[in-house]
Amino acid sequence: MELGYLALVLHAHLPYVHHPEFPDFLEEDWLYEAITETYIPLLRVFENLTNQGVKFRITISLSPPLLSMFKDSLLQQRYLGKIEKLIDLAEREVERTRWLPQFH
């Protein structure tokens, strides 16, 4: 006997924060953090579920400002730059804490 259904509905929105007049704009970090900490991990979960043969359904709504920022080539380039900086920082932190066993 079926007891019911669970509907997952995710809504993604961020305010439009594109500022080409500045090389680095703090509010753009909201987008970069959301991509890194939310959207990419969600896609990985969906991919893993699919690879494991799990049948799932999900509804995702993406706001027009968010979609506009996703497709903006300048924001894409800036995001890649932010990721490169994070990788560099992580590598330097590993080196800095190499001799501290509580960090490894």
Per-segment meaning from a language model:
Residues 1-56, 69-104:
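N-terminal regions that are enriched for targeting/export leaders
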Residues 61-66:
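Short, solvent-exposed turn/loop segments enriched in Gly/Ser/Thr/Pro and often Arg
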